[in-house]
């Protein structure tokens, strides 16, 4: 009887160990898959960035197209087509510069960060919320008001603890009034593997200054190609949505 019970116990133990091993393997695979997704989505809001490349390099608005041709500009119809793509939940189109030496508050130069010319969809698509003051409204665009938003990192770097709202900063020799401070809803935990990813993270921690895209020519004097951020309806559809938008 004891021998029979022992064999039954060992059989059950073997089954339990086998099931536990399968669960562990499935959990490991699932965990690896989730890590890959986490690496892909970055801030966790299912967004994909699409930017203009020239050859093997990103387009640089400081120098333009090296062959002397005009850079391609997005039409309103192209933007609408992107918004209507399958699995695209939202999209935003914006100008971008990482050379911010032309941005000043009094005698403080905004170095190392980014300046964006954004549309009304940008904050929502990229997961920003207004921490103080207000965000952009339609009248800011319609009337081409020289107003600016700063994220919390730019606020710290430019204003050193002062309340930025109501202050005036200079962008490309034009005065812009700070109307709000914004920050992203989710904490971004970077997985830095390349020098480009390090540069992007460095620019992020230095901060971002945002103006209405209608005001971009005031500060930088001419039209430039726009970048896009696409928010997919799920993590699994990010790649297909991003590729469709790029096409």
Which residues make up each language-model segment?
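N-terminal Sec/SRP start-transfer signal
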Residues: 1-19
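Phosphate-coordinating loops and pocket residues in cytosolic domains that bind phosphorylated ligands
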Residues: 3, 42, 84, 160, ...
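Juxtamembrane alpha-helical signal-transduction segment immediately C-terminal to a transmembrane helix
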Residues: 11, 15, 25-28, 36
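Residues that line or immediately flank small-molecule/substrate-binding pockets and catalytic motifs
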Residues: 13, 95, 171
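Hydrophobic, regular-secondary-structure patches
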Residues: 30-114, 121-124, 139, 157, ...
């Amino acid at each position: 009887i004891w021998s029979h019970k022992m064999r039954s116990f060992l059989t059950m133990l073997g089954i339990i160990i086998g099931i536990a091993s399968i669960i562990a393997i499935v959990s490991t695979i699932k965990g690896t898959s989730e890590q890959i997704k986490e690496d892909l989505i970055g801030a966790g809001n299912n967004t994909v960035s699409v930017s203009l490349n020239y050859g093997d390099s990103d387009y640089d608005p400081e120098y333009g197209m090296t062959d002397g041709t005009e850079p391609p500009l997005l039409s309103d119809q192209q933007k609408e087509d992107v918004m209507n793509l399958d699995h695209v939940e939202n999209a935003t189109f914006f100008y971008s510069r990482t050379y911010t030496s032309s941005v000043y508050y009094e005698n403080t130069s905004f170095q190392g960060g980014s300046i964006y010319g954004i549309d009304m969809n940008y904050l929502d698509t990229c997961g920003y919320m207004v921490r103080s003051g207000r965000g952009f409204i339609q009248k800011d665009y319609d009337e081409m008001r020289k107003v600016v938003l700063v994220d919390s990192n730019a606020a710290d770097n430019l204003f050193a603890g002062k309340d930025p709202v109501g202050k005036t900063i200079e962008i490309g020799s034009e005065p812009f009034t700070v109307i709000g401070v914004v920050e992203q809803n989710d904490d971004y935990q970077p997985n830095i593997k390349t020098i480009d990813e390090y540069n992007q993270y460095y620019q992020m921690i230095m901060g971002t200054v945002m103006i209405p895209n209608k005001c971009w020519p005031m500060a930088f004097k001419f039209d430039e190609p726009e970048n896009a951020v696409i928010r997919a309806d799920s993590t699994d559809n990010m790649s297909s949505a991003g590729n469709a938008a790029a096409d």
